[in-house]
Amino acid sequence: MSKKAALIIMDGFGIAPPTAGNAITQADTPHLDRLFSEYPCAQLSASGLDVGLPDGQMGNSEVGHTNIGAGRVVFQILPKISQEIRTGKFFENKVYIKAIEDAKVSGKALHVMGLLSDGGVHSHLEHIFAMLDMAKARGVEKVFVHCFLDGRDVPPTSGAGFVAALQKKCEEVGNAHIATVQGRFWGMDRDKRWDRVERGYNAIVCGEGVLAEDAVKAVEDSYAAGVTDEFVEPVVVCPEGAINAGDSVIFMNFRPDRAREMTWALNLPDFDGFERKKEVFPLSYVCTAQYDETLTLPIAYPPEVITNTLGDLMSEKGLRQFRVAETEKYAHVTFFFNGGVEKQGEGEDRCLVPSPKEFPTYDLIPQMSAEKVCDKVVEAIASEKYDLIVCNFANCDMVGHTGVMEAALKAVETVDACLGRIAAEAEKHPDLTLLITADHGNADCMFDENGKVNTAHTTNPVPFCVTKKGARLENGRLADIAPTILAVMELPQPAEMTGRSLLK
């Protein structure tokens, strides 16, 4: 009989020196302090080359959970696309070419959508610019850009600079125009807050929104009104740039979770999230990555198959698993943890705890749904039904993104209280080992030494604590978590898992 393990992922919990802006060290965390002092602890790299991203690139939840579940470094789509742009292979992508040629032959417009940022989490500015070059080279006459502003993975007022750069690029190619600009809060929702998506959709499809002649000035006016990039109200710069039936659309976001809802709204005949004032059903709609495996839309960069993930091994061995998170991170402990596979594994139970929808931002409810997630974990441990439990607490990341220090402190303390309850139950079960970690940093830097608010992830390492007294842990990277879990459970490690157990 194998041993049991419970993996607790504290999303956005990085390790950094104590500073006034470090909510992790400023918060009161008696339970984590005890666990980290009583049990072996190490630090894990969660960014850059160690998670399959470009050197120096901050990690993110999708990448982190993919690496954790796979037990190997999984090279990501961001560096792949960037490399193909450099080699010229990007410009030969047949899926992109088909959409471009459809627009050219039909005389219709080509629409390029994407998060306008160099944050590299959901998209990259460089990729959008390369697409504009490609459309120009292939002779498309009408190209319209619908851009979402970031403000989370990059500074909250960096958007005006990105829009200015896009405006300059459009002038350079000559056939492209900025059609709409909006904060990601609207068109890049992932929690089925359809009122938000509807506002974004109506700007892109119906030309409804704040009318402006100059995109940069519209963003700067938003700043003057106290509204930063993420929340910029949908702005219509070029009303004739609305998407119409028969047009071609290329969505340049490569991360699925915040690209799905707008894609559904634009493409599904039976879509019921909101009543569409205008249906467009584009002639060609290209997803840069796979946004939803149930969609039949063309994908420029199809997913690579990751075999023998930690979840696969549990199913293969006939072991029971329990995955739990609130809505904001549910896809991460299921789809991403399973290597981009939506299908539930044999013996894998899942629990989705709804994230609170009644507040527009999580600084207003920093506890989120953590207590309910904690209840489910404690119940699962107490039941002794499961061999592996995987849980995510979203607070330090989601509240960290708001940039509000007081709320981040409450978020960290909420997670600490939950870990106290989970550890108390786990310590009643000697055959179960608790493994505590994070997928990337965030709340460890809420503002810098100059007091400038930081809403982005960090490149700091993350903790790794294993409740095995007397053992020793080496430092490593996220890819080493699954092999360590297998070692704890006394199960063999498959050849595909190139990470290593950090237990010594």
Model-derived features: positions:
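Feature captures the catalytic ectodomains and active-site-proximal regions of enzymes
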Residues: 1-504
